[in-house]
């Protein structure tokens, strides 16, 4: 299994052979959706701030990252038709936020691996290839404690994102990487704005097939799409919101990406990420999500 996954990292395939399979659902209280806010008059900005604060999990001391131009998805250890469905769904959601999906045979940035024992597999994977998870550059991941939680957690799906500070104008890496000299970057001095932003570079997603049996392939693919495109805190409490992130707690309640999810992704990918202060950056994302919400609801409103 591990050998196949490591081979996939280099030549990433769209799959091999294991069926998708999670523990019984736990009922959840009524969740807040965007339409509820309109009906009940609750403050959208406050709810959005809380959602972003709960969900967003950027690298240590960095802003919220996103993919720059496009991404290539590779899926290993699933039947070909299932692997292709997940690949296509993640690529479609990526395209919806303005990213270019990878061509067939592309070198993957996102590795999705299905396994019957995610904990054992992850420990072995990390032991064999530690450097692909902890690259060593400053501000590229959430740190040692988060990495240990990634290895040891018992969730149906676990993930690890790698991002890097870059010059927003050029896309060039703006930090010193292990084994390389310090980068030469020209920036405009300012106390308010910055040219240095964070780009997602890699995502590793490991699916435990024994713990995903109560969700459909469509639900699993949408869940994977969301955690691929955004840096999500695995411990986020989103029980009060209608979001695909709740799918393993209550599969019947969340069938697909919700308006919350779509607004979050659209807001993340349309915001201008130039604030020097990370708190101000997050406020920009919140404002962008609110604008995305207004666009979504205006399109869906009956005439």
Regions picked out by a protein language model, each given a short descriptive name:
Residues 15-16, 20-22, 28, 40:
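Boundary of Sec targeting at the N-terminus
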């Amino acid at each position: 299994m591990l050998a196949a996954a490591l081979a996939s990292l280099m030549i990433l395939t769209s799959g091999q052979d294991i069926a998708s399979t999670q523990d019984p659902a736990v009922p959840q209280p009524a969740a807040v959706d965007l339409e509820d806010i309109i009906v009940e008059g609750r403050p959208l900005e406050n709810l959005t701030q809380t959602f972003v604060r709960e969900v967003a999990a950027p690298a240590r001391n960095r802003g919220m990252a996103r993919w720059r131009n496009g991404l290539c998805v590779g899926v290993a250890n699933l039947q070909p038709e299932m692997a292709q469905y997940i690949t296509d769904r993640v690529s479609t959601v990526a395209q919806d936020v303005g990213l270019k999906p990878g061509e067939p045979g592309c070198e993957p940035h996102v590795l999705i691996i299905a396994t019957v024992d995610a904990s054992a597999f992850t420990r072995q994977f990390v032991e064999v290839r530690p450097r692909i998870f902890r690259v060593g550059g400053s501000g590229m991941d959430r740190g040692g404690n988060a990495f240990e939680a990634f290895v040891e957690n018992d969730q149906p799906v676990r993930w690890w994102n790698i991002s890097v500070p870059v010059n927003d104008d050029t896309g060039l890496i703006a930090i010193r990487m292990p084994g390389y000299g310090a980068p030469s970057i020209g920036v405009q001095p300012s106390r308010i704005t910055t040219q240095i932003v964070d780009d997602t570079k890699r995502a590793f997603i490991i699916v435990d097939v024994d713990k995903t049996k109560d969700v459909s392939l469509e639900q699993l693919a949408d869940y994977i799409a969301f955690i691929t495109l955004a840096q999500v805190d695995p411990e986020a409490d989103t029980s009060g919101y209608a979001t695909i992130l709740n799918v393993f707690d209550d599969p019947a309640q969340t069938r697909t990406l919700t308006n919350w999810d779509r607004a979050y992704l659209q807001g993340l990918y349309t915001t201008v990420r130039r604030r020097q202060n990370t708190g101000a950056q997050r406020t920009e994302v919140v404002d962008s999500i609110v604008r995305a919400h207004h666009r979504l609801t205006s399109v869906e409103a009956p005439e």
